[in-house]
């Protein structure tokens, strides 16, 4: 078995992340100096839409917005939880051409691999995309996992598809 991770840039609604058992690691942004978590698994779809509207309304009003990077320590913590649960890890990142998240996850994976992964694997896939194009990869991985595929089988199948996906905004 393996656990699937995405960052909140995948824009997976909480109900979809829960349905497909996908772990979402949230960005934390600053809006006019106030920390705002980008993902909350407890929000209803209506609350998620309202939170998104508030974010873009703040942007339109000229509020100072700073995006954050998910720390290597956060990735280590989340990946370690999966390893401790006797599972492999598969992470789909926001494009490394947009964010440093892939590198943070890579450093975390290297740190964990240098110690003890209990024989489990950590696979990282740069989606080379953003938004739901990133999330769709995780949904496909979930379906493959449910069919009994290993982390390597799922990752090896999905990684070549990265270059064939386009995000439309």
Predicted ranges, named:
Residues 19-21, 118-121:
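A short helix-to-beta-strand connector/capping loop
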Residues 111-120, 147:
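Short helix-capping segments at alpha-helix termini
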Residues 76-89:
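Glycine-rich phosphate/diphosphate-binding loops that line cofactor/substrate pockets in enzymes
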Residues 3-74:
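N-terminal glycine-rich anion-binding loop in soluble enzyme alpha/beta folds
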Residues 142-169:
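Internal, active-site/partner-interface "lid" segment
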Residues 128-146:
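Glycine-rich phosphate-binding/hydrolytic loop that grips phosphoryl groups
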Residues 88-96, 123-126, 140:
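Short glycine-rich or small-residue beta-strand-to-loop segments that form or flank ligand, phosphate
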């Amino acid at each position: 078995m393996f656990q699937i991770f995405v960052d909140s840039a995948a824009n997976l609604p909480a109900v979809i992340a829960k349905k497909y058992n996908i772990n979402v690691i949230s960005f934390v942004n600053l809006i006019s100096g106030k920390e705002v978590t980008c993902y909350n698994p407890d929000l209803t779809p209506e609350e998620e839409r309202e939170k998104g509207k508030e974010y873009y309304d703040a942007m339109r009003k000229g509020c100072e917005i700073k995006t954050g990077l998910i720390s290597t320590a956060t990735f280590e913590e989340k990946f370690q939880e999966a390893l401790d649960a006797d599972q492999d890890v598969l992470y789909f990142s926001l494009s490394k051409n947009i964010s440093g998240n892939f590198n943070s996850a890579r450093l975390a994976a290297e740190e964990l691999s240098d110690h003890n992964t209990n024989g489990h694997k950590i696979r990282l896939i740069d989606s080379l995309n953003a938004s739901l194009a990133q999330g769709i990869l995780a949904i496909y991985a979930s379906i493959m996992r449910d069919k009994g595929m290993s982390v390597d089988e799922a990752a090896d199948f999905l990684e070549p598809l990265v270059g064939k996906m386009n995000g439309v905004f």
